[in-house]
Amino acid sequence: VGQTMSRAFDSLNLSGRGVRIGVLDAGFGGFRTDRWTRGLHVAAWRDFTGGDETAFIDDATDHGTRVCTNLGGRSGDTIRGLAWGAEYYLAKTDRAEVEPRAEERQLIRGIEWLLAHDVDVISSSLGYTTFDDFSGYTPAMLDGRTSTLSRYLDSLLTARPGLVFVQSAGNAGDQAWRHVSFPADVPQVLTVRSCDSGGHYRTRP
């Protein structure tokens, strides 16, 4: 409760109704059978990785489903996510088992698709540092304007100040990288990093 401020949210009688949320991830497996997400209103979904659209919610990767649980998960009167009444748009732009540089472009295509649906909030769990061909970036480039995605988002969010873009910090906090991944370095992006129950962060700014 302390980390999500759900008591304050409940006191205002909010549910996310009237809000359009776009979610960018590597898979939404089990979305329609999971107890926390099967009741969410999904207005549209799309796969930008060349996968089978008919098998979108049967994907082997369920990270996006877990994210949606945190955003709006609800089972009966038990609530896991605060925006259980929002309208959701799901975009798969990444395949978890590979890291080609093309996934940067796929993520941008996913964002453009979400914008065409006039979403209010975009949540992305996808960040990049090094690709399968050993190309990539260095921590010195974390300036909000060097990487392909950082340049794109800096321009987009400057032009659309009302759009909320939430980005995961990345999973390299306890690895050699030790910093956020791109595009979490963009100043207008709301970057979320993980912490334990004691409030200790895994990733340095």
List each language-model region with its residue ranges.
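A generic structural motif
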Residues: 1, 46-47, 125
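Stable alpha-helical elements in mature extracytoplasmic
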Residues: 5-8, 63-67, 103-110, 145, ...
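Subtilisin-like serine protease catalytic core
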Residues: 8-104, 117-121, 131-133, 159-162, ...
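Short, well-structured alpha-helical segments in soluble
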Residues: 109-117
